[in-house]
């Protein structure tokens, strides 16, 4: 039985992984063949999925075992990424709380919360909405009724 010796979290574009320095510098020293990983990742993330589409940033959790085998799980895009897409922003506020960069209606917040409910460890939609509102505030996005 092999034992997990490392766990790695990466943000990668769904369906667009290439064996470049960003991935190779993390996986290469641990003995993971980068081209094979990229091929498997692209195969998994290019399939139709309700939580993300090809090109979206997704969170990848890689478990590396002592026999140099690995497995990975893909979860949807981070909340901050989804909020920036909804608000059509390239970056969030450098000074949140004092500098607002966008306003989002509550309907957009609920949409993001529903999308992320699978990844969040919450029991109900209200808790997920509160978490997304907190992230929005920390990014300098004001939540308005609507």
From Swiss-Prot:
Keyword Ribonucleoprotein listed: yes
InterPro entries reported for this sequence: Ribosomal_uL11, Ribosomal_uL11_C, Ribosomal_uL11_C_sf, Ribosomal_uL11_CS, Ribosomal_uL11_N, Ribosomal_uL11_N_sf
GO CC aspect terms: large ribosomal subunit
One MF term in the entry's GO annotations: large ribosomal subunit rRNA binding
Record-linked CDD domains: Ribosomal_L11
Cytoplasm as UniProt keyword: no
Pfam families (alphabetical): Ribosomal_L11 (PF00298), Ribosomal_L11_N (PF03946)
Protein keywords: Methylation, Ribonucleoprotein, Ribosomal protein, RNA-binding, rRNA-binding
Disulfide bond entries: none
Free-text description of this protein's post-translational modifications in UniProt: One or more lysine residues are methylated.
Source taxon at top rank: Bacteria
Protein's GO biological process: translation
Family stated for the protein in its record: Belongs to the universal ribosomal protein uL11 family.
HAMAP family: Ribosomal_uL11
Protein role: Forms part of the ribosomal stalk which helps the ribosome interact with GTP-bound translation factors.
Family annotation (PANTHER family): 60S RIBOSOMAL PROTEIN L12 (PTHR11661), LARGE RIBOSOMAL SUBUNIT PROTEIN UL11M (PTHR11661:SF1)
Quaternary structure and interacting proteins, as annotated: Part of the ribosomal stalk of the 50S ribosomal subunit. Interacts with L10 and the large rRNA to form the base of the stalk. L10 forms an elongated spine to which L12 dimers bind in a sequential fashion forming a multimeric L10(L12)X complex.
Name the UniProt record assigns to this protein: Large ribosomal subunit protein uL11
Organism per entry: Wolbachia pipientis wMel
Organism placement in taxonomy: Bacteria, Pseudomonadati, Pseudomonadota, Alphaproteobacteria, Rickettsiales
Protein's gene: rplK
